[in-house]
């Protein structure tokens, strides 16, 4: 093609819902920490590139948690951090700090700060005997952990944070309070900055089903067998299509409340779609959705051939919008480029990484017919976790990427809805495969024994709630919310044998707790199966053995 190739970058912002339904306290700190490291900074970085346009998702349940922190909510790690300056830590809290407060990339963060590295070495030397470490040690560790989770640019731009980084030790109560206060400010500021950027035409904000459920599985859990006929599915099946629609409708309501406009696009949780999910998107009055190229391949019986550098040989098969039979528009991400950013480019220099990305786009553009298209390359991935694998929190890569795209006349970054307004889809997609961004199936969330146990107790709890109160829409909020939370994808992600973290037991407990409160609200005793872990026995033993500091080389499955 001779004109500019439109490039749609979509950064997905999501964390599980960490608020415990029985205590209303946050049991894990990752929303607060990612607000300090990613959410605010990813939006603020665009101020340096006024011609670059980007798309973001912000899951409604994530924005709820950010607002809670802005109003003064705490998590366990905040409270432990504050207690270090009182010198009143219990032995259990000291153990907890040694297990949690090195949970950040060792090579790209801890190793870059001599004092933080020294604290890790002392922790290793004192393994199993935290009483060997002084009260001052834990004050310094608390501040370093929280400081290290703040974006390096924000530290450099704040005189006091920069002074704390350079001083490196002997921190005070005032120092600790200042760092936590800055994190709270960042959580407060992030949604407002996104709203401002969208109002100025710089970004488009997509939505996601409210508590991040896998729509096809909420609609009918048997749909997992469409991509994998041998998948284990719960018996009786989980079949609540109106729950899926309600998760979408409430996401739209939340989006209007938070950002002042109705969302036009949606990234279905994990890019998981099905014909029925597309119909729910239509009913929620959302114009378009995005998923993965492999879903398109299975839908249209296409194979996306790539050359030696990973560029598409026939990019016109992927780089365009598609019109479904119900009128909804679909885009599908370039998996090669998206996954390179997410999993590979962090090990390369920014110059080489961006050069590789542009090389792929350039080759694809040169192969596109000069027929007016419309052609659009979609790059879609996690907008927070990827940067932990990059030096300097990915800032050097992002600046190089945005600067290169802004200067290269062959490409134009776009807000997706702007592009679709100017270039409606010309190609029909009569069939839509049921699958997600991972292998075009739903195996990560359904199909294993632990999955089956979790879906079974969720179905039993959902059926009980239906008998007590009727549909999800008719339930009292104190029942409806934990049920919607329990329908979220994250619990099932961690029940998969593919995924593990030091927090596996916490995720299991949160899932069961959200189910339990529904029974209690009705004055009923929860079933026995909710009173014991749903994880496989081997996983429980493995997680129980992961104590002490997170060591270099161990799986870094945090946040």
Question: Can you describe what each PLM-predicted range is?
Answer:
Residues 165-187, 191, 294-296, 301-304, ...:
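Extended, Lys/Arg-enriched charged tracts that mediate electrostatic binding to polyanionic substrates
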